[in-house]
Amino acid sequence: MVFASNVTEEEIKKERSIARELRQSTWWKRKCADGTCYYCNSRVPAKLLTMDHIVPLVRGGKSVKSNIVTACKACNNKKKYLLPMEWEEYLLDLT
């Protein structure tokens, strides 16, 4: 999918690099230790949680703590590049 965005590949690479560094941090390890998916509230073993950007990098999101949450693989794969409002609409369509 293509977005009308001014986000360059270089910016995305930079943000992914920052995200890799955050994955090594005590902050991220504590978030994973909680074992909860931000989106579905499922309990998930820490090693199976993924890092998700609430506002995706391709949509202009940044790799900052306020934009990063733990997500189960199922939710992360379904959410992909959706913004929070779009994700909510997706969930409503399921019901």
Q: What is the predicted role of each segment?
A:
Residues 46-47, 78-81:
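Short, non-ligating residues that shape and space the ligands of small metal-coordination modules
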Residues 50-56:
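Histidine-centered catalytic micro-motifs used for acid/base chemistry in nuclease
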Residues 35, 49, 70:
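Cys/His-enriched microdomains
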Residues 1-39:
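Short, charged surface segments at domain edges that flank catalytic/cofactor-binding sites
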Residues 60-78:
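Short beta-strand-alpha-helix junction that forms the catalytic/metal-binding core
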